[in-house]
Amino acid sequence: MRESISDLMTVMIPLLIILLLSNYSKSVDLEFYLDTPELIKSWGYSVEIYNTTTKDGFILELHRIPYGREVPTSSDVNNSRPVIFLQHGFLCSSFDWVANSPHQSAGFVFADAGFDVWLGNFRGNTYSRKHVSLNPDKDPKFWDWSWDQISEYDLPAMIGKALEISGQESLYYTGFSLGTLTMFAKLSTDPKFSRKIKKYFALAPIGSIKHAHGVFLFLGRHFGKDYEEYVKKHGSDELFGSSLLFKKIVKYTCGLFDTLEEFCSDITLLFIGTANENWNQTRIPVYLAHTPAGSSSNVMAHLDQMFSYGGVPTFDMGEEKNLKAYGQKLPPQYNFTGIADVPIYLFWSDDDWLSTKQDLEETLFAQLNSQVVQGSFRIENYNHLHFIWGTNAASQVYNVITGIILQDDNT
């Protein structure tokens, strides 16, 4: 009898769990399952996909929203429109710019304003996990790069493709987080590149991260050095690549009950700052279905070095490799004082735990020429991700950028 009851329980408990999951799980938004091009189409916008190859062989995928949701007229097609290039941050993708409803998402807001919108994807993420000869699943060399190479190779390849297809000579660049750091580095090391950038809008701009708060501060202090040594010893590898398993975990945790959804939101906020009424907790399952989108462990090690050393050092590969690459034992520092000829607009917040005011004061505010910085916008009560996912980011950030571009384009 006891054996029969035990057998019955063995069958019934899994069935009860399945029934509970099916009856009480919340419906997940459609965008949970869609990739970026599919998501753009689902909102009624046109989308185009392009590939570009970097000088070191990485194949990067670009997503273009050529027009707004309204059907373009023949004059719209024939007339040149402002080209705006949007570049995501660390472990992110082109999804970030279309993550919310059209009136809240930068990609859609700019398209509806009449701009030719391009969304970039850095090497190693969901959409740019390709190379002319290296296999990301078999060749460790595929992952042997830091954000130095992203700045040196990815930005010119992607922006060059956008200019080639659009027929323009220069464009408006909007970067978020790592998308700002890499552009600052590019402009400081390649002054001629400034000819391709009409204006540069930096959201949650990164100079140094020595004074970061939250979980990143804890991890950097207690595990940063060990992580750097591990990467130096064992080599770089894929870091937090997107996977079907992770999506399922997100769906059946963050997307299951309101309490778990709130828990997932709280975990996210430990890294970036506090929430407010402009933080859409109900979208967390969708955000986490697309983020993290993958990168190289060398990039994380490089960020750890920035936290440890201060300033903006190039990647420290160890004395022997540093001597070969840089001609000196220690990695040289980037210097932003020489950036010229590109009007820069900074959008930042005192409440951002990754792009802190103290770090901005010690790097970007201190080094950038005052004539180059034509706007510095302090946004109240914004954490790091509010700049791309905040429900009022359109009014606080994107509409400001739109006004600046339209005024510039009409002069």
From Swiss-Prot:
Q: Which GO terms describe its molecular function?
A: triacylglycerol lipase activity
* Superkingdom, natural source: Eukaryota
- Give Gene Ontology CC terms: cytoplasm; lysosomal lumen; lysosome
Active-site residues? 177, 352, 384
Q: Which residues cross the membrane?
A: none
- Catalytic reaction list: a triacylglycerol + H2O = a diacylglycerol + a fatty acid + H(+); 1,2,3-tri-(9Z-octadecenoyl)-glycerol + H2O = di-(9Z)-octadecenoylglycerol + (9Z)-octadecenoate + H(+)
| EC main group | hydrolase
Q: Explain what the UniProt record notes about the effect of disrupting the gene for this protein.
A: RNAi-mediated knockdown has no effect on global lipase activity. In a glp-1 (e2141) mutant background which lacks a germline, reduces the increase in both lipase activity and autophagy.
| Keywords in alphabetical order | Glycoprotein, Hydrolase, Lipid degradation, Lipid metabolism, Lysosome, Signal
Task: Outline the inducing conditions.
Answer: Up-regulated in the intestine by fasting.
One Pfam family of this chain: Abhydro_lipase
| UniProt KW Hydrolase keyword | yes
The record describes the dependence of activity on pH as: Optimum pH is acidic.
Q: Where in the cell is it found?
A: Lysosome lumen
List the EC numbers from the record.
3.1.1.-, 3.1.1.3
Against Gene3D superfamilies, the record matches this protein to: alpha/beta hydrolase (3.40.50.1820)
Its signal peptide is: 1-27
- Give the record's glycosylation annotations as residue positions: 51, 78, 280, 335
**Does the keyword field hold Transferase?**
no
Name the protein family.
Belongs to the AB hydrolase superfamily. Lipase family.
As for what it does, the entry says:
Lysosomal lipase that regulates the metabolism of long-chain fatty acids, primarily in response to nutrient availability. The production of these lipid signaling mediators regulates various processes, including lipolysis, autophagy, mitochondrial beta-oxidation, which in turn control lifespan and adaptation to starvation. In response to fasting, promotes the production of omega-6 polyunsaturated fatty acids (PUFAs), which in turn activates autophagy resulting in lifespan extension.
Recorded hits in PANTHER family, A to Z, give: LYSOSOMAL ACID LIPASE-RELATED (PTHR11005)
* Record's protein name: Lipase lipl-4
Which organism was this protein described from? Caenorhabditis elegans
